């Protein structure tokens, strides 16, 4: 790497990070820890680095102490592992002291883990971002030797979305009719919570989402993994969007994709699902009462942001509702989140936290009400003491049935109070 380019970018970025305006995220950093921030493209990882840089400057650090470097800058080409040392040397020639490293999208450089580990061993303070879920894996944690804290980064929560829209909740908001709140929720429900969408005009939001999806699809999936059957990958993602509410086996997905894209083996589907998850586009839940060997092969799949799911569906309301609940629970509870399927199905359960959730657009239909409450009753018998919830679009009540107490709560209220 030409050190002149590195020095130009270092100085340019030091000016930039001081002046960026952002919505402060509800993520705190320990002052003596190193971090790896992992999440979907455009989920706000870079802005978290800016937030942390501004916090450190407010605490007395000089802007010149911060070495922020974006490895996806279009002025950089064909970066190698050795270029990381060149960037470090360029900074030291400029200032003559140790920087605070903020390395954005470093995963595009093969072997970056070794450099990151060496920096930590040499007592540098380091913050790293990446758009590949492999950076969350135990393998990476082992390579980094426990020297970094790994922080998943998600799109805006509904509360953060309201803050970004400058909508504040009045006292006793739970009991008031608030048109601004409801309007903001419906937009968040359909368009999602990617931070940059807040400043995009409404008429262009769907186009912006489509462009980002194409970048993930072509850049992070087709090109990165050398996919030889792009139609199969495209079809698989669409089939996942159409089946958000149902468990899907590898064999069923292989059959569905094969009807469109030619014969696709089950092993290929397993690989493709792993790639899709690695981009942080999709996550999954397992059946808590299935045998261990069956859990992986019959999962439910959800999209990490409702905006992407909206791109695929013509009548998306019920799917978007369950997907949004899944996002919230996944962000809060991670791998503790399951579904329950044993003759009856409960959409989400948190065994360790003694909670179970059904998701229904409306609970007014008598047959639907009987079926879904019956499933919660069956779950309660198997896991006594669980708190039971029904998340709806806009209905609220408390149901007391025999020994059961079930809270029915609108999703917009649940997102702000749970």
For every predicted segment, state its role.
Residues 2-13, 133, 139-246:
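Interdomain motor-coupling "hinge/lid" segment immediately C-terminal to the ATP-binding subdomain
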Residues 13-32:
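Pre-Walker A adenine-sensing motif
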Residues 48:
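Hydrophobic positions on the alpha1 helix immediately C-terminal to the Walker A/P-loop
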Residues 65, 199-356:
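Accessory nucleic acid-recognition modules appended to NTPase machines
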Residues 67-97:
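Short glycine-rich substrate-engagement loop in P-loop NTPases that contacts/grips substrate
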